[in-house]
Amino acid sequence: MNWITNYVRPKINSILGRREIPENLWIKDPTSGEMVFHKDLEVNQYVIPSSGYHMRISAKNRLTHFFDDGVYTPLENPKVVIDPLKFRDEKRYIDRLKDYRSKLGIDDNILSARGTIEGLPIIATVQDFAFMGGSLGMASGEAIIKAFDTAIAEKCPLVLFSASGGARMQEGTLSLMQMPRTTVAIEMLKEAKLPYIVVLTNPTTGGVTASYAMLGDIHIAEPGAMIGFAGPRVIQQTIRETLPEGFQSSEYLLKHGMIDMVVSRLEMKTTIARLLRLMMKYPPVVNPSNTSSTNSQASLSKAEAA
């Protein structure tokens, strides 16, 4: 046995050898190809600094950036029956759920919490697209209803961030039932005369668009978000016509009166806080910590004048 071969060489190789580098250290901007360091992106709420492109953001990160000082109290989601239909396609549905829960550390795609934004108490509900495409199922339906019930009980407004591909096909009719159930919860909030603001993020489609995502008092969209019922490719194949440029984008919907405003994620908190002060008749803040963009200020000034 040669001690150089068995001992020295492995030591040298361990020091000089190639080390595994995590794949997610640098994030590529889909629009420009620019590489952005993941820590810089996280600090900037996953908005590319140079282009303003809005990357997808996890529900936990969104709540942390949205609430004052990142402090909030999560609402416990109700427990539901798992996979009552015993659904299976290429993989058992129950196994898919286990995989997503293990990977993301959440039970389903809805996270709700109570906290404050610029001192205003609110309930916020966020859909996480990373969990089965943000699909609406029994668990997410129950979680949304729980958030509305909590807002009513605590007499505070509710802000919902939608991100979904639609109803969860693995739950069939049980998934579709969540559309009218969440609609009833919204009506109860409105009867209590409490504001309901929806923030449409990329993408918001399918049954979610056909229910709670388009029933808010005010609809705000993030820049470049795709919002619609069916996807543009399906529509184009059905009507056999070329769709307008930018069809179903948040900017297109704003231009055609489908939503109220398009606001950068970086200005979302300040914009929503100002809207809630108008709607709840709270006194204005003289010097808010964040400033809104010129477009947002103009839109809100019109609302105040009205």
From Swiss-Prot:
InterPro entries: AcCoA_carboxyl_beta (IPR034733), Acetyl_CoA_COase_Trfase_b_su (IPR000438), ClpP/crotonase-like_dom_sf (IPR029045), COA_CT_N (IPR011762). One of its GO terms (molecular function) is ATP binding. Residues 25-294 form the CoA carboxyltransferase N-terminal domain. One of its GO terms (cellular component) is acetate CoA-transferase complex. Keywords: ATP-binding, Cytoplasm, Fatty acid biosynthesis, Fatty acid metabolism, Lipid biosynthesis, Lipid metabolism, Nucleotide-binding, Transferase. Belongs to the AccD/PCCB family. This is Acetyl-coenzyme A carboxylase carboxyl transferase subunit beta. The gene is accD.
